[in-house]
Regions:
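H-loop/switch region of ABC-family ATPase nucleotide-binding domains
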Residues: 219-220, 474-475
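Conserved ABC ATPase signature
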Residues: 159-163, 414-418
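Conserved beta-strand-loop-alpha-helix hinge in the C-terminal portion
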Residues: 239-261, 491
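Conserved ABC ATPase "signature" region
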Residues: 137-155, 393-410
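Catalytic Walker B motif of ABC-type/P-loop ATPase nucleotide-binding domains
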Residues: 184-187, 439-442
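ABC ATPase NBD Q-loop/coupling interface
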Residues: 85-100, 347-360
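ABC ATPase C-loop
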Residues: 176-177, 431-432
């Protein structure tokens, strides 16, 4: 155990769990979505005032559903049947009006843009407070306080739909905290945050916890929570299988921890990998042109520069990690490569051919971070086959890819019924099934547990061996170390 780990494990709760008031409890709770099998089975748990409980476990185990049970979305917005008793404080949740429940429980969804109602930052935070009937002075004070807590002042004038995925996540968290709820229920709040932003989130949550805020967090990424979490509840197949302490998580062997679906509890150093342009220089005598060449690319939003003079060469068989801080322009660059956004200047060549942004749509696969808008068919199997001929060759290839990504057993399910991590893997499967030789994925491991991160890494390695060039926008140091061959940092 490292010195850093030792200092973490010496942090103890100053008040015994049993002695504190209960912020929320579930007693023998089960939930089944409409026209679907039961997702949560006979779960009982309690969260004390000022306590942080982390729900962890494999993708699709029921963590998101438990968060929805607590914040009231399960059974109302998400149609289905709830059994058992849910209490918030000393009140039965069924006795509370929806606005009363929203005042007590702040929510952060896995897809932050799905909870936005306003076009800009301040309006988004104010919206929640205004709907709870706060007077103007209180709304302004709460909005300014939330913006300050997350250092978001520079985003005040930027439309929410123009923010990076990480910036959107920060806005969603700030919005949930605006009215100062008693309990914060969050689903993968760090999935799109860079290491620095995740660490800042951890420090902010620690301060709020010290002020008495209770938290339930569904999360795979644990390092930023190790100074905050009191307990880790391992969720598997819709049940709480085991309760773990910080010491348990730190002490678990890597294989056991991965079998639980948990990422490393220690901050993972970014691997030292070569810049892709260095490899291109060494291969300058090659007869075949590179798979992808970017020269002098520039992008801006209105009068604000996003990046300029970006040049990059990617060879077939390489997996390049595109890294950088939230807001550096990684998603913008990925969308330009996929032909979804025009660059202001510069050129892009694919296998030696200069491409317009329309050409890029046909020659480069782009897998977005927001995968919910990507699916069009009623089943996983049909989605994987959507862009290819329905012949035996492609059917066999789809079967193999779905097996590799642990989706074959879900092949008849509608994509909308999948968990966040399962949707992410289906998006990757669609890219691998395409005929594109250049693949670009935006945060392909967000929402993935440790085992499924390994599954995705293996699938991308196979594609690279087949001669494809792959670029992944990512903050995931574990993933980079597992499969990437090069790193390109956008500053």
């Amino acid at each position: 155990m490292t010195a850093g780990a030792t200092s973490r494990t010496t942090l103890h709760r100053t008040v015994p769990h049993e002695a504190r008031a209960t912020a929320a409890s579930l007693r023998n709770v089960s939930f089944a979505y409409k026209n679907a099998p039961e997702t949560v089975h006979d779960v009982s748990l309690s969260v004390a005032s000022g306590e942080c409980v982390v729900l962890c476990g494999p993708s699709g185990s029921g963590k998101t559903t438990l968060v929805r049970v607590i914040n009231g979305l399960a059974g109302s917005y998400c149609k289905g049947t709830t059994e058992g008793v849910v209490t918030l404080g000393e009140c039965d949740a069924t006795d509370l009006e929806q606005w009363e429940r929203a005042e007590r429980v702040g929510s952060v969804f896995q897809d932050p843009s799905s909870q936005f109602f306003s076009s800009q930052l301040a309006g988004e935070i104010a919206f929640t407070c205004e709907n709870l009937g706060y007077d103007h002075e209180r709304v302004v004070a709460a909005t300014d306080q939330a913006i300050s807590a997350f250092s978001l002042d520079s985003l005040r004038k930027i439309p929410n739909d123009s923010l990076s995925s990480g910036q959107k996540q920060k806005v969603a968290i700030a919005s949930a905290l605006g009215p100062r709820p008693q309990l914060l229920a969050m689903d993968e709040p760090s999935s799109n945050l860079d290491e620095e932003a995740a660490a800042h989130l951890g420090r902010t949550l620690a301060r709020l916890k010290a002020e008495g805020l209770s938290m339930v967090i569904a999360e795979h990424r644990l390092a930023y929570l190790m100074d905050v979490a009191d307990r880790f509840l391992l969720v598997r197949d819709g049940r709480i299988e085991q309760e773990l302490s910080r010491t348990d998580v730190f002490a678990a062997p890597d294989d056991l921890r991965r079998s639980w679906g948990l990422r490393s509890p220690r901050r993972t150093a970014r691997p030292k990998l070569p810049h892709p342009n260095e490899s291109a220089t060494k291969l300058s005598g090659a007869t075949e042109p590179p798979a992808l060449e970017i020269r002098g690319l520039r992008a801006a939003y209105r009068s604000n520069r996003i990046f300029e003079d970006v040049s990059l060469t990617v060879e077939a068989g390489q997996i390049v990690a595109l890294i950088g801080k939230n807001g550096a322009g990684k998603t913008t660059l990925a969308r330009i490569l996929g032909g979804l956004k025009k660059a202001q200047a510069g050129s892009i060549r694919v296998h030696g051919r200069t491409c317009s942004y329309r050409d890029l749509r046909r020659r480069v696969w782009f897998g977005p971070n927001d995968v919910k808008a990507e699916f069009f068919t009623p089943s996983v199997k049909e989605e994987a086959m959507l862009l290819v001929k329905p012949d035996e060759t492609h059917k066999n290839r789809a079967r193999g890819i779905l097996h590799d990504l642990d989706l074959w057993e879900l092949r008849e399910q509608h994509p909308a019924t999948l968990s966040g991590g399962q949707k992410q893997r289906l998006s990757i499967a669609c890219g691998l099934m395409s005929d594109r030789t250049v693949l670009v994925f935006d945060e392909p491991t967000s929402g993935l547990d440790a085992l499924n991160m390994e599954v995705v890494a293996g699938a991308l390695e196979t594609a690279a061996r087949e001669g494809r060039a792959i670029i992944v926008v990512t903050h995931d140091s574990e993933f980079i170390g597992r499969c990437c061959t090069h790193i390109f940092e956008l500053e």
